[in-house]
């Protein structure tokens, strides 16, 4: 099979694929997968079957393959389920119309998306979950469907900043290199030791872990747990039960929030309260949104 050109000005080329390559095999199943799912959109990419495959479709297929160690059958099943889930949740319909769901004051200040420059010089998107900003446990976590929609909305915004539909950088094969199209997550637990016994929080945490593992493969580079009290150790045991050993290796636990910046990246991209020299999370998020608005205009 010939090399694949990206639909970009740089005319990037995906490494040549043989007919028996896992990507070629998964691509050949796309017609069936798309037909059965009744949906073809994911993370800003419209999956299409062609020979050779489109560059953006390969980005998506490669993520699903890497998540299951190149098992084509498992990747095809997982992709089909995710596409059906996205259709049921109406995620891409809202994205097409550029509609944003309003979750109300119960979720204000709980989640942010920013960009940092890593210690190795590359840019990285970061999602922030500020659990200390929860005003009322039942109001925020009691309606599980609403909480999950909020969490998915935060994830979808972060993924949009990865620009998977227009990237010109391919993803290496499984065990052949690092996927450059991933993000970091920061979970801030300062002041939330009281969450341990709340059943709404436990249910929301468990459901979120399962949903993310099933529908957002290979999007996590690093996951920071900051200011975690010992009483909440149950959460980390729960997380490790629902993710792969490879994913668990990405977890970093930081006791003191001021130490986060040194682990995360360039100080200017991290708020001062977390050891950086940057603006507040809200200001950094608005800055990123402004940059993307200029780029896409």
Curated annotation (Swiss-Prot):
It is a peripheral membrane protein. Its cofactor is heme b. Its main location: cytoplasm. Keywords: Cytoplasm, Endoplasmic reticulum, Heme, Iron, Lipid transport, Membrane, Metal-binding, Microsome, Transport. InterPro entries: CRAL-TRIO_dom, CRAL-TRIO_dom_sf, CRAL/TRIO_N_dom_sf, Sfh5. GO terms for cellular component: cortical endoplasmic reticulum; cytosol; endoplasmic reticulum membrane; plasma membrane. Residues 106-282 form the CRAL-TRIO domain. It catalyses: a 1,2-diacyl-sn-glycero-3-phospho-(1D-myo-inositol)(in) = a 1,2-diacyl-sn-glycero-3-phospho-(1D-myo-inositol)(out). It comes from the Eukaryota. Heme binds at residues 131, 151, 187, 189, 223. Coiled coil: none annotated. One of its GO terms (molecular function) is metal ion binding. It is found in: Cytoplasm; Endoplasmic reticulum membrane; Microsome membrane. GO terms for biological process: Golgi to plasma membrane protein transport; regulation of exocytosis. Non-classical phosphatidylinositol (PtdIns) transfer protein (PITP), which exhibits PtdIns-binding/transfer activity in the absence of detectable PtdCho-binding/transfer activity. Regulates PtdIns(4,5)P2 homeostasis at the plasma membrane. Heme-binding protein that may play a role in organic oxidant-induced stress responses. Belongs to the SFH5 family. This is Phosphatidylinositol transfer protein SFH5. The gene is SFH5.
């Amino acid at each position: 099979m010939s090399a694949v050109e990206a639909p970009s000005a740089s005319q990037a080329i995906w490494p040549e694929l043989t007919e028996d390559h896992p990507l070629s095999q998964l691509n050949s199943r796309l017609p069936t997968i798309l037909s059965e799912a009744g949906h073809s959109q994911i993370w800003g990419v419209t999956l299409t079957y062609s020979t050779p495959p489109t560059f953006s479709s390969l980005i998506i297929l490669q993520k699903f393959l890497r998540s299951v160690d190149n098992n084509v059958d498992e990747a095809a099943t997982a992709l089909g389920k995710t596409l059906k889930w996205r259709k049921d949740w109406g995620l891409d319909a809202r994205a097409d119309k550029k509609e944003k769901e309003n979750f109300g004051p119960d979720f204000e200040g709980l989640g942010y998306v920013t960009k940092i420059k890593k210690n190795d010089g590359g840019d990285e998107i970061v999602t922030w979950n500020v659990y200390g900003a929860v005003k009322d446990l039942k109001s925020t976590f009691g309606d599980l469907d609403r909480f999950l929609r909020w969490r998915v909305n935060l994830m979808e915004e972060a993924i949009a900043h990865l620009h998977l539909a227009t990237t010109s950088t391919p993803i290496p094969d499984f065990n052949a290199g690092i996927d450059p199209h991933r993000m970091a997550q920061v979970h801030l637990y300062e002041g939330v030791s009281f969450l341990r016994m709340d059943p709404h929080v436990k249910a929301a945490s468990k459901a979120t872990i399962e949903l993310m593992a099933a529908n957002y493969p290979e999007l996590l580079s690093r996951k920071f747990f900051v200011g975690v009290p010992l009483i909440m150790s149950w959460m980390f045991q729960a997380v490790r039960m629902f993710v792969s050993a490879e994913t668990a290796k990405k977890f970093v636990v930081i006791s003191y929030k001021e130490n986060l910046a040194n682990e995360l990246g360039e100080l200017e991209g991290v708020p001062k309260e977390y050891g950086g020299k940057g603006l507040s999370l809200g200001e950094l998020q608005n800055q990123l949104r402004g940059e993307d608005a200029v780029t896409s205009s």
